[in-house]
Regions:
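Catalytic pocket-lining loop regions of alpha/beta-barrel enzymes
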Residues: 1-66
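Single, functionally critical "micro-switch" positions that shape active/binding sites
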Residues: 69
C-alpha cells in the first residue's frame, strides 16, 4: 500500500507520530508491527510550502517527502520553482528525491 498525503500540509505529523508511539506503549501486544514505522513505510507527505520541510525530512526521511506546488491556486507559490530555495539545505540526492524522484516512483505503475 502506498499513500500520498497531499493538500493537508505536514505540521500535524510530529504530533501524530508521537501519539501513535504513545499508544503502542500504553497497549503492549496490540500491534503486530510498530504503527509509526508502518506509517513511515507506506505514506509519502507533501508539505505546504510554508511548512518546515527539514523537520518533515527528519520525521519521514527524504525518500517519503514529495514536492507539490499547489499552483495555480492562490495559496500556492506564484513560481513553483522557487521551492528550490526552500530545500537548498538538503544535499543534492535528497533534493532530487523530494523535487522529482519520489513522486515519479510513487506514480509509476508497479508490476503485479
Amino acid at each position: 500500500l502506498r499513500v500520498a498525503s497531499v493538500e493537508n500540509g505536514s505540521d500535524y505529523l510530529a504530533l501524530l507520530l508521537r501519539k501513535l508511539g504513545q499508544q503502542v506503549s500504553k497497549t503492549p501486544g496490540w500491534f503486530d508491527e510498530d504503527p509509526v514505522e508502518l506509517f513511515r513505510q507506506h505514506v509519502w507527505m507533501n508539505p505546504f510550502w510554508e511548512d518546515d520541510v527539514y523537520e518533515l525530512v527528519d520525521l519521514m526521511g527524504a525518500d517519503h517527502v514529495i514536492f507539490g506546488s499547489d499552483w495555480p491556486h492562490i495559496e500556492g507559490m506564484p513560481s513553483p520553482l522557487d521551492y528550490l530555495t526552500e530545500v537548498k539545505e538538503l544535499d543534492n540526492d535528497d533534493r532530487r528525491l523530494v523535487m522529482r524522484d519520489n513522486t515519479r516512483s510513487l506514480t509509476e505503475p508497479r508490476p503485479a
